[in-house]
A protein has these predicted regions:
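Glycine-rich flavin
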Residues: 42-50, 54-151
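Short segments within alpha-helical structural elements
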Residues: 325-332, 363-367
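Glycine-rich phosphate/cofactor-binding loops in nucleotide/flavin-utilizing enzymes
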Residues: 336-384
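Glycine-rich beta->alpha junctions and the first turn(s) of the following alpha-helix
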Residues: 185-186, 191-281
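A short core secondary-structure module
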Residues: 144-177
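Generic structural signal for well-ordered, non-transmembrane alpha-helical segments
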Residues: 238, 274-281, 313, 317-324, ...
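C-terminal helix-coil-helix/basic helical segment that borders enzyme active sites and/or dimer interfaces
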Residues: 28, 32-35, 282-318, 331-339
Length: 384
């Protein structure tokens, strides 16, 4: 049986819905407390749960919103414009949630009929899984688990003793969590490490991505890592747009010490701001056009080509890097105003420079894409 979602994100065809705007306002208001406590506040998590944000990409038959991915990206951008950590947690949960669509129908239903459900994960450090007593025996250590403090399910990949990889789903109370998240940016994601030892996991809670997914649609055709690539780039776009808004407000009233002009009157500031705005618009158009073009093809053909994979990989990485440049320009324009911790632009600066350090933002991918352009041979891997 399903349940009734509060209409924050439900059927968000018009993104100006009053309830969605109210949710965005609450995200912005909650951000300082979230930053201080290094986790999303409970009240905000409850609102996000009931909005359907954590199940935005799950099919309606399993009580999800089943949002088109292009529309989902727009929502992530708008959340990130208010607070990067909230957008990061929502996106991490919503995208990794789609891996549950390889589980049996009964388990998918069990997960998502719970109105409070959300999934957290992390990249593997040392993780092994083997067949045992009709199930699987799992020992592993994973990191960077954004949103794990409010998750109802954990999942993580592990190397299978018989070859390849498997992902296991298990409850948070079956894992040990290590608070290693003492960082400068994206503080409120609370991205702890987690581990299990000799955990017996039922076979029905194990995913083999070499098998066909239980649900077959455009979302399960898109590689999960590449969905993360373009959706984390969407987070970057929201952060960068917010930084531009911040510096415009600063420029309205600031007259730097010993300067002849206010920032808003300074031709250099105007030029830098114009360039930053153009770069943001170019990055936004590039990401959204690439995503729409590839997803439309995947929707029609139920397959993704190497060329399309390369397009998503390139768009995700490039846009993250461009957004950092935009934020840096805004930060430079702000002068000493931008250095204070209570200044919103400072938080965006820190958040953006954590995003660039993420595996999805690595500039080394450009080399892979260049080799593909020259040779026509695409190197598939966990991130490509």
């Amino acid at each position: 049986m399903g349940f009734v979602l509060l209409p924050f994100l439900k059927k968000v065809i018009d993104l100006e819905l009053e309830n969605f705007v109210s949710l965005l306002d609450n995200i912005a208001k909650s951000a300082p407390l979230a930053e201080q406590s290094r986790r999303l506040p409970d009240q905000l998590v409850t609102e996000l749960r009931m909005s359907g944000a954590f199940r935005a990409l799950i099919p309606k038959k399993f009580s999800g919103l089943e949002l088109p991915f292009e529309q989902y990206l727009d929502i992530i951008k708008r959340i990130a414009e208010q607070d990067a950590s909230t957008a990061w947690c929502v996106n991490q949960a919503a995208v990794i949630a789609t891996t549950s669509l390889w589980l049996p129908d009964q388990i998918i239903s069990e997960i998502w009929e719970d109105p409070f459900a959300s999934v957290a994960n992390g990249p593997p450090y040392s993780c092994n899984i083997s067949s045992d007593d009709g199930g699987y025996r799992l020992t592993g250590h994973w990191g960077f688990s954004s949103g794990c403090q409010h998750a109802t399910w954990m999942t993580g990949p592990a190397r299978f003793s018989e070859g390849g990889w498997r992902s296991a789903f298990f409850r948070p109370d079956q894992a040990q969590f290590d608070d290693t998240w003492h960082v400068a940016g994206l503080r409120a994601t609370g991205s702890f490490e987690f581990r299990v030892k000799d955990l017996l996991v039922p076979a029905t809670q194990i995913v083999n991505f070499d098998d066909d997914s239980t649900v077959k649609n455009d979302i399960t055709t898109l590689p999960t890592a590449l969905m993360f690539a373009i959706s984390f780039a969407a987070v970057g776009l929201g952060v960068a747009k917010g930084a531009l808004s911040d510096v415009i407000k600063i420029a309205q009233g600031k007259k730097p010490q010993w300067a002849a002009l206010r920032l808003r009157e300074d031709p250099d500031v105007q030029r830098f701001l114009g360039k930053a705005t153009a770069r943001w618009r170019s990055a936004d158009t590039y990401l959204m056009h690439t995503a729409a073009e590839v997803i439309d093809s995947v929707r029609r053909n139920q397959e993704i080509s190497h060329s399309q994979r390369s397009q998503l990989r390139m768009a995700g990485t490039h846009v993250i890097q461009e957004c950092a440049e935009v934020v840096d320009l805004a930060y430079k324009i702000s002068g000493s105003t931008g250095i204070y911790q209570d200044e919103l632009l400072q938080r965006r600066f820190q958040d953006m420079h954590v995003i660039t350090q993420h595996v999805q933002g690595r500039e080394s991918y450009f080399g892979l894409l260049g080799r593909y352009a020259i040779s026509g041979d695409y190197e598939t891997g966990p991130m490509t």
